Amino acid sequence: MSEPFKSGFVAIVGRPNVGKSTLLNHIIGQKIAIMSDKAQTTRNKVQGVFTTDESQIIFIDTPGIHKPKHKLGDFMVKIALNTFQEVDLIYFVIDASTGFGRGDEFIIEKLKNVQTPVFLLINKIDLISPEDLIKLIEQYRELMDFEEIIPISALEGNNVPNLLEQTNANLEIGPMYYPKDQITDHPERFIISELIREQVLQLTREEVPHSVAVVIEGIEKNPKTEKLTINATIIVERSTQKGIIIGKQGQMLKQIGMRARKEIESLLGSKVFLEIWVKVQKNWRDKEHYLHDYGFDREEY
């Protein structure tokens, strides 16, 4: 007789830039959580759905937990903390190459108050020696009683199959929440805006920080050619940032558009014409009605 089907929700938490989105994208096999080496790139709870014949795991990729500096930061931390209560299992991801940080202390204090089992995932193990890894495991073991401690490399995929096996062992018997071929419950508009935002963050580096939102104004399909026309607006806080994003003779914006278009085409599997505008909206991160307009939901505060 075949084993009963299992399912459950898993939250991925950790300091900014420890590789949470990389891990989610490796497991799902498609780019659904924005990846960039800047802190604070994941803003909304992106759900990735991983389904096999035996089980379905719904992943929730939370924003990096950090002490908030403004309303947007406050919002992001609140989402992450609320998530702990809603899931069946928590992956707490740390970066082996940077070791124990003050941010980890902040997260561990929060995790200690939660009933949910926690897996400690030591990521980027390819960057440290086995001796240092053992020391790190011992250091974290003293801080908290983890359900499992699993060293991985999210980028290379090392030990990820073992992680999924341990995850399945911790799931309860449950239904298939999403159709088998569905990998995320985020509408396509949201993922398209995230792919554009990823390119802005990657290409402009520190010059344009997190004061960037992307709004998809419209998506139209040409019935004859099947080609999609997507109109998007990049929102920044200062006109100097607008200048940086547009670049000399529009070169930077052209680069952003070209790279984002390739990502969007591979996501949607169809040809895309992408038109991007840049707009200045002063201090949008501190104005609630703008946060709502740009996809941040008040109910999650």
UniProtKB/Swiss-Prot annotation:
Keyword DNA repair appears in the UniProt entry: no
Similarity annotation: Belongs to the TRAFAC class TrmE-Era-EngA-EngB-Septin-like GTPase superfamily. Era GTPase family.
An MF annotation (GO) of this entry: small ribosomal subunit rRNA binding
UniProt keyword Nucleotide-binding, yes or no: yes
Residues reported in the UniProt entry to bind GTP: 14-21, 61-65, 123-126
Gene Ontology terms: biological process: ribosomal small subunit assembly
Gene3D superfamilies hit by this protein: 3.30.300.20, P-loop containing nucleotide triphosphate hydrolases (3.40.50.300)
Role: An essential GTPase that binds both GDP and GTP, with rapid nucleotide exchange. Plays a role in 16S rRNA processing and 30S ribosomal subunit biogenesis and possibly also in cell cycle regulation and energy metabolism.
Domain called Era-type G: residue spans: 6-173
Matches recorded under PROSITE patterns: G_ERA, KH_TYPE_2
Quaternary state and interactors: Monomer.
InterPro entries: G_ERA_dom (IPR030388), GTP-bd (IPR006073), GTPase_Era-like (IPR005662), KH_dom-like_a/b (IPR015946), KH_dom_type_2 (IPR004044), KH_sf_prok-type (IPR009019), P-loop_NTPase (IPR027417), Small_GTP-bd (IPR005225)
Species per Swiss-Prot/TrEMBL record: Listeria innocua serovar 6a (strain ATCC BAA-680 / CLIP 11262)
Ranges where the record places region G5: 152-154
HAMAP family, per database record: GTPase_Era
Region (G2): 40-44
Region (G4) residue spans: 123-126
Keywords: Cell membrane, Cytoplasm, GTP-binding, Membrane, Nucleotide-binding, Ribosome biogenesis, RNA-binding, rRNA-binding
A single GO cellular-component term on record: cytosol
Primary location recorded for the protein, binned into one broad class: cytoplasm
Name of protein: GTPase Era
Region (G3): 61-64
Topology within the bilayer: Peripheral membrane protein
Chain segments annotated as transmembrane: none
Classification via PANTHER family: GTPASE ERA, GTPASE ERA, MITOCHONDRIAL
Localization: Cytoplasm; Cell membrane
